[in-house]
From Swiss-Prot:
GO terms for biological process: catabolic process. NAD(+) binds at T25, G26, A27, I28, N279. InterPro entries: Acetaldehyde_dehydrogenase, Acetylaldehyde_DH_C, NAD(P)-bd_dom_sf, Semialdehyde_DH_NAD-bd. It catalyses: acetaldehyde + NAD(+) + CoA = acetyl-CoA + NADH + H(+). The active site is at C139 (acyl-thioester intermediate). The keyword NAD applies. The lineage of its organism: Bacteria, Bacillati, Actinomycetota, Actinomycetes, Kitasatosporales. It comes from Streptomyces griseus subsp. griseus (strain JCM 4626 / CBS 651.72 / NBRC 13350 / KCC S-0626 / ISP 5235). Coiled coil: none annotated. This is Acetaldehyde dehydrogenase. Its EC number is 1.2.1.10.
Length: 308
C-alpha cells in the first residue's frame, strides 16, 4: 500500500525537537550529520566513530556536535536518544541492534543488514509506526523501489533487473564489504514491493574520471508495453521521490516489444558531497525524512542524550 499522500506534509513547520546520535563517520555519516544540522526538527547530540582523526568527526565538531571515537559504547553510555542513525556496515549493525533494542530508541539503519522494517518513503510511507528498527535498504533500493513498485502496480511485470553504478571514490570500505548484503537486501526489497520473484541486482563501482554520477538502470519485462503509459507511471513515481530527494530524475524511459528500460540519475543536493554522490544523498534524505516524521509524531515521549 502506498502512503505517499503524507509526504507533502512530512516536514511540519513546528515540531518538538528529537535528539539524535549518529554512528559512523565516513562520507555517508558526514552528509547525514550535515542534513541533520539543517533540520529544524532534529538535534544532533552525538557523533560516534572509531578513528579519532577521521574527517567525519572533525566535520561534526565544526558544526558544534559532541563527538567520540568510542563508537557504539559511547552511544550506549550517553543514551537515551530519540533516534540513533547507524551508518556503519551490515555486520556492525547486527552487533549494534541487540544493544540498542532495549533502550526503546528509534534506530534508523542505513546499512543493508535486513534486520529492521524496510522503508522507501514514497512506497511505505515515512512514519515509523511501532517499528523500533527501520531499514533504508540500500542506495539502489531507494532509487529503484519507487519505480518498480509503480510499474508492477500498473503492468504485468514478469522480470526485473536493477543495475546501479556508483563512483569509486564515494564507495567506501563499508560499501565494498557490504556487496553481498547489498545484492541480497536490494533484491529482497524489489521483490517485496513489486511482487516480482524473478529479479537480478547488480552494483557497479566505477573508477571513471571524471567520476560517474549515481545511476540506476531498470530493465523490466512487460508484455505489450505501451511506451507512453509506462513513461507516465515512471514520471509520477519520480515526482514523488523529488519531494524529499530533489536531485532524482528520469534520464530515459523506453519500451520496445516486451522490454522496458528506465534510466534514473540522482544528483546529490548536499553541503559536503560532490554532485555525483547521489547514492549517498538519496538514502540520507530518506533517513532524515523518517526521523523528522518521527519527531512530529503526536504523543511521542522525548528522551534526552548528552548535552550539545
Amino acid at each position: 500500500m502506498s502512503l505517499t499522500a503524507g509526504l507533502t506534509d512530512a516536514r511540519p513547520d513546528t515540531v518538538e525537537t528529537a535528539t539524535v546520535a549518529v554512528i559512523g563517520t565516513g562520507a555517508i555519516g558526514r552528509d547525514l550529520v550535515s542534513k541533520i544540522d539543517r533540520s529544524p526538527g532534529l538535534d544532533c547530540r552525538l557523533v560516534a566513530g572509531r578513528n579519532p582523526e577521521s574527517a567525519g568527526l572533525r566535520y561534526a565538531e565544526s558544526l558544534g556536535c559532541a563527538t567520540t571515537a568510542a563508537g557504539i559504547d559511547a552511544v550506549l553510555a550517553a543514551s537515551p536518544f530519540d533516534v540513533v542513525f547507524d551508518a556503519t556496515s551490515a555486520a556492525s549493525h547486527r552487533d549494534h541492534w541487540p544493544l540498542l533494542e532495549p533502550l526503546g530508541t528509534l534506530v534508523i539503519d542505513l546499512t543493508p543488514s535486513k534486520v529492521g522494517q524496510m522503508v522507501a518513503p514514497t512506497v511505505t510511507g515515512v512514519a515509523a509506526e511501532d517499528a523500533r528498527n527501520v531499514n533504508l535498504i540500500s542506495c539502489g533500493g531507494q532509487a529503484s523501489v519507487p519505480v518498480v513498485h509503480a510499474l508492477a502496480a500498473r503492468f504485468p511485470v514478469t522480470y526485473l533487473e536493477v543495475v546501479s553504478t556508483v563512483a569509486s571514490d564515494v564507495a567506501g570500505r563499508a560499501t565494498r564489504l557490504n556487496l553481498d548484503e547489498y545484492v541480497t537486501a536490494t533484491g529482497h526489497a524489489v521483490t517485496t514491493f513489486s511482487g516480482v520473484s524473478d529479479v537480478k541486482i547488480i552494483l557497479n563501482i566505477s573508477p571513471a574520471v571524471p567520476p560517474a554520477t549515481f545511476r540506476t538502470v531498470i530493465h523490466a519485462r512487460v508484455p505489450d508495453a505501451d511506451a507512453a503509459a509506462v513513461r507516465a507511471v515512471v514520471d509520477r513515481a519520480a515526482e514523488q521521490v523529488r519531494s524529499f530527494a530533489p536531485g532524482y530524475e528520469v534520464v530515459a524511459c523506453t519500451a520496445a516489444d516486451d522490454l522496458v528500460t528506465i534510466v534514473l540519475k540522482v544528483t546529490a543536493c548536499s553541503d559536503v558531497l560532490p554532485p555525483y554522490a547521489g547514492n549517498l544523498d538519496i538514502i540520507n534524505a530518506a533517513a532524515v525524512l523518517v526521523a523528522e516524521q518521527y519527531a512530529a509524531r503526536p504523543g511521542r515521549v522525548s528522551r534526552t542524550g548528552v548535552s550539545s
